[in-house]
């Protein structure tokens, strides 16, 4: 016997929420793939300074996002099918998956909040080491290539106004093509550009996580209400 009345409304409401959840999973997967292959971050995080690679903490978070997006699409489909079929087993499985996903999202959110400044900090340290080697040692070709990539990608020169002046005077070939001492002094420094690059992307990820968490809470409530409604309708 199918559900009737308010329970039937909840059934279709849950279907709509699950469809939105499935779409959100697709969006997160798409955004994660875009962040993974974004030219700016790819240019910077694929660099190597001697035997030392650029920090990859940012990519760890991106790979987690890719996995989350794929799982969300599967769970969203499971919820849609369970709601339409009025299956307590599928809805119970769906609820369990949601609880696990929600717990993982909370854990990832805490990790992200704790490490939100660490990613940019590690990249800035990597850049500073390369810049120091490039300015001091004329034969440090690897370091020069790393610094040049940072400067061309971010359109900056030096980690501060002082280093911008020093680099422009001593090693102007490390600065972006077509720049001069005056233009370099009025540009944002590379430390600020690195902060802006990663904080903007982390802000986008944070908004997506909050939206998904709200949807998941509603889905958990609706799935349990529908499950109880199906059980009661089968009794009568």
UniProtKB/Swiss-Prot annotation:
CDD domains: CD81_like_LEL
Mutagenesis or variant effect for residue 196 to E: Strongly reduced affinity for HCV protein E2
Positions marked as site (Important for interaction with integrin): 116, 144, 148
Positions of disulphide bridges: 156-190, 157-175
Extracellular face of the membrane: 34-63, 113-201
Bilayer disposition of the protein: Multi-pass membrane protein
Keyword tags: Adaptive immunity, Cell membrane, Disulfide bond, Host cell receptor for virus entry, Host-virus interaction, Immunity, Lipid-binding, Membrane, Receptor, Transmembrane, Transmembrane helix
Pfam families: Tetraspanin
Parts of the chain on the Cytoplasmic side: 1-12, 85-89, 225-236
Top-rank taxon, per record: Eukaryota
PTM notes: Not glycosylated.
Cross-referenced SUPFAM superfamilies: Tetraspanin (SSF48652)
Effect of mutating residue 188 to K/Q: Strongly reduced affinity for HCV protein E2
PROSITE patterns, sorted: TM4_1
Tissue: Expressed on B cells (at protein level). Expressed in hepatocytes (at protein level). Expressed in monocytes/macrophages (at protein level). Expressed on both naive and memory CD4-positive T cells (at protein level).
Family statement: Belongs to the tetraspanin (TM4SF) family.
Domain comment, as recorded: Binds cholesterol in a cavity lined by the transmembrane spans.
Disease: Immunodeficiency, common variable, 6: A primary immunodeficiency characterized by antibody deficiency, hypogammaglobulinemia, recurrent bacterial infections and an inability to mount an antibody response to antigen. The defect results from a failure of B-cell differentiation and impaired secretion of immunoglobulins; the numbers of circulating B-cells is usually in the normal range, but can be low.
Assembly behavior: Homodimer. Part of a complex composed of CD19, CR2/CD21, CD81 and IFITM1/CD225 in the membrane of mature B cells. Interacts (via the second extracellular domain) with CD19; this interaction is initiated early during biosynthesis in the ER and enables trafficking of only properly folded CD19. Part of a complex that includes MHC class II/HLA-DR molecules and IFITM1. Interacts with IFITM1. Interacts with IFITM2 and IFITM3. Part of integrin-tetraspanin complex composed of CD9, CD81, beta-1 and beta-2 integrins in the membrane of monocyte/macrophages.
Role this protein plays: Structural component of specialized membrane microdomains known as tetraspanin-enriched microdomains (TERMs), which act as platforms for receptor clustering and signaling. Essential for trafficking and compartmentalization of CD19 receptor on the surface of activated B cells. Upon initial encounter with microbial pathogens, enables the assembly of CD19-CR2/CD21 and B cell receptor (BCR) complexes at signaling TERMs, lowering the threshold dose of antigen required to trigger B cell clonal expansion and antibody production. (Microbial infection) Acts as a receptor for hepatitis C virus (HCV) in hepatocytes. Association with CLDN1 and the CLDN1-CD81 receptor complex is essential for HCV entry into host cell.
Protein name, as recorded: CD81 antigen
Organism per entry: Homo sapiens
Gene of this entry: CD81
